[in-house]
């Protein structure tokens, strides 16, 4: 399995993703510039956290127009795995690959800490090695991570099992239904505000995020 980590101007978690996949998981990973216009030869795509284009206008609002994004959209529509963390999640909502939106935290402050999550859905390429209902701890670091959707969409997400991760002990940003991560209807696109790539070694505090990437690599072995 060959994995692309997209690098936008202002990305700052691209290296974290690369290290989690390449150094810790021994995966075949390449950085791909936002200036490129194809993803030929790749089997999965990662959109990193950070502040793409300085978060001007709105988080992810300018990144959605990057030359690489039509290829990401086509990649996802072909059923291939696409993952976005933090700013990557915001970009995925901006381009319409994931429903809803991310707005400013209710506290109006940047929040940086480790939070407890509940795993709600293990039937995705990114969560198959977790157990449904399992509690895990992952870091967050964002100012605009409050998930919003209207009542009809929220009901649809819950009914379809599209909520993958939910804030457990506390809701750090005001996300509706305590939502921390969701998939599209097909289940091949996952966006989440927490950073699993920052929790892949005990040196970093815990390894609770490691199975996001190992699940993906196992998926690649099965389909490969």
UniProtKB/Swiss-Prot annotation:
* Location(s), subcellular: Cytoplasm
Question: Quick check: keyword Transmembrane helix in the entry?
Answer: no
Name the reaction it catalyses. Answer: N(2)-formyl-N(1)-(5-phospho-beta-D-ribosyl)glycinamide + L-glutamine + ATP + H2O = 2-formamido-N(1)-(5-O-phospho-beta-D-ribosyl)acetamidine + L-glutamate + ADP + phosphate + H(+); L-glutamine + H2O = L-glutamate + NH4(+)
Name the SUPFAM superfamilies on file.
Class I glutamine amidotransferase-like
| GO molecular function terms listed in the Swiss-Prot or TrEMBL record | ATP binding; glutaminase activity; phosphoribosylformylglycinamidine synthase activity
List the Pfam families hit by this protein, alphabetically.
Answer: GATase_5
Q: Which residues are named in the active-site annotation? A: 86, 195, 197
HAMAP family registered for this protein in UniProt: PurQ
Sum up the protein's function in the record's words: Part of the phosphoribosylformylglycinamidine synthase complex involved in the purines biosynthetic pathway. Catalyzes the ATP-dependent conversion of formylglycinamide ribonucleotide (FGAR) and glutamine to yield formylglycinamidine ribonucleotide (FGAM) and glutamate. The FGAM synthase complex is composed of three subunits. PurQ produces an ammonia molecule by converting glutamine to glutamate. PurL transfers the ammonia molecule to FGAR to form FGAM in an ATP-dependent manner.
What is the protein named?
Phosphoribosylformylglycinamidine synthase subunit PurQ
Q: Which organism is it from?
A: Ligilactobacillus salivarius (strain UCC118) (Lactobacillus salivarius)
Point out the gene that encodes the protein. Answer: purQ
């Amino acid at each position: 399995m060959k994995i692309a980590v997209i690098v936008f101007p202002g990305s700052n978690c691209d290296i974290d993703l690369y290290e989690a996949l390449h150094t810790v998981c021994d995966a075949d990973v390449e950085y791909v510039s936002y200036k490129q216009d194809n993803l030929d030869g790749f089997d999965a795509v990662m959109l990193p956290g950070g502040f793409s284009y300085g978060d001007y206008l709105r988080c992810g609002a300018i990144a959605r127009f990057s030359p690489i994004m039509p290829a990401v959209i086509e990649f996802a529509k072909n059923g291939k795995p696409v993952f976005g963390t933090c700013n990557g999640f915001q970009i995925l909502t901006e381009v319409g690959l994931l429903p809803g939106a991310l707005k400013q935290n209710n506290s109006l402050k940047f929040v940086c800490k480790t939070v407890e999550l509940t795993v709600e859905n293990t039937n995705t390429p990114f969560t198959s090695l977790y157990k449904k209902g399992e509690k895990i701890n992952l870091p967050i670091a964002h100012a605009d991570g409050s998930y919003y959707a209207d009542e009809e969409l929220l009901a649809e997400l819950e009914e379809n099992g599209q909520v993958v991760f939910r804030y457990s002990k506390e809701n750090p940003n005001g996300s509706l239904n305590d939502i921390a991560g969701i998939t599209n209807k097909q289940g091949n696109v996952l966006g989440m505000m927490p950073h699993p790539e920052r929790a892949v070694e005990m040196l970093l505090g815990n390894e609770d995020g490691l199975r996001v990437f190992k699940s993906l690599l196992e998926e690649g072995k099965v389909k490969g």
